[in-house]
Amino acid sequence: EFTALSLLFSLLLLTASAEQCGKQAGGARCAAGLCCSNFGWCGNTNDYCGPGKCQSQCPSGPSPKPPTPGPGPSGGDIGSVISNSMFDQMLKHRNDNACQGKNNFYSYNAFINAARSFGGFGTTGDTTARKREIAAFFAQTSHETTGGWPTAPDGPYAWGYCFLREQGSPGDYCTPSGQWPCAPGRKYFGRGPIQISHNYNYGPCGRAIGVDLLNNPDLVATDPVISFKSAIWFWMTPQSPKPSCHDVIIGRWQPSAADRAANRLPGFGVITNIINGGLECGRGSDSRVQDRIGFYRRYCGI
């Protein structure tokens, strides 16, 4: 089971603000000699301390190098953490006729295949820690792809992984970039479990998984393994200047004094901040935040 302990450990942040320091946080300073980036986050890499990227507590010399984290304890295959039957129970209505993925696009085998490409995902720490990460991952991605509604059969939190593509009439999500140039006629709206969007995410994601997603972004909505890989890549990769979702949920990320003062503590809420904090956090009660928590509660109880 995904235990109640996992839930109590992780539901620590419901209304976090999106910044830690500087003008975005009322002049707050970073602890432990960390730099305050132009975006209001504390850290010690070039994204925080580099020329033109640091607003306060900036170094006079080269940016300090971050410490190299030691490998966390791990064990077992991802299949030992989440079984096929558990996967089906969690994503109970993903193949409903009203869902884009109704022909078993989001399959258990595709998930396992993709997950095994990312060392440490769902396999770091003890059994409770591994289950906590899987519950958090599926809760966040279920919110992004939900087809549920308040009176839906089996409740709104049984309808994750319904959609493949962003709903409505999304734009092209193209930001001019020399490193990740947009391909003619291609659009980089949300696709897949995490609804990856923007060329500056499709580009590095594709490079990491060995696929040209700048020229072929719709592979995220047509190839099940690539679709899952895009979500796990986002989960495992630091979203500068924020940490990775993975590092937060396994306890590797340590909050600064400013984080603690703003109630940004290790847990599920910080992950919401990483994924969509600019729109959902620091605004009091938000139905989207509550939806993410609702999925997490359900999965922790399975």
UniProtKB/Swiss-Prot annotation:
InterPro entries: Chitin-bd_1, Chitin-binding_1_CS, Endochitinase-like_sf, Glyco_hydro_19, Glyco_hydro_19_cat, Lysozyme-like_dom_sf. Transmembrane segments: none annotated. The active site is at E144. One of its GO terms (molecular function) is chitinase activity. Residues 61-72 have a biased composition (Pro residues). It is an enzyme of class 3 (hydrolase). Belongs to the glycosyl hydrolase 19 family. Chitinase class I subfamily. One of its GO terms (cellular component) is vacuole. Keywords: Carbohydrate metabolism, Chitin degradation, Chitin-binding, Disulfide bond, Glycosidase, Hydrolase, Plant defense, Polysaccharide degradation, Signal, Vacuole. One of its GO terms (biological process) is chitin catabolic process. Its main location: other. It catalyses: Random endo-hydrolysis of N-acetyl-beta-D-glucosaminide (1->4)-beta-linkages in chitin and chitodextrins. Residues 1-18 form the signal peptide. It is found in: Vacuole. It comes from the Eukaryota. Its EC number is 3.2.1.14. Residues 59-79 are annotated as: Disordered. This is Endochitinase 4. Induction: In response to infection, elicitor, ethylene, wounding. CDD domains: chitinase_GH19, ChtBD1_GH19_hevein. SUPFAM superfamilies: Lysozyme-like, Plant lectins/antimicrobial peptides. Disulfide bonds join C21-C36, C30-C42, C35-C49, C54-C58, C162-C182.
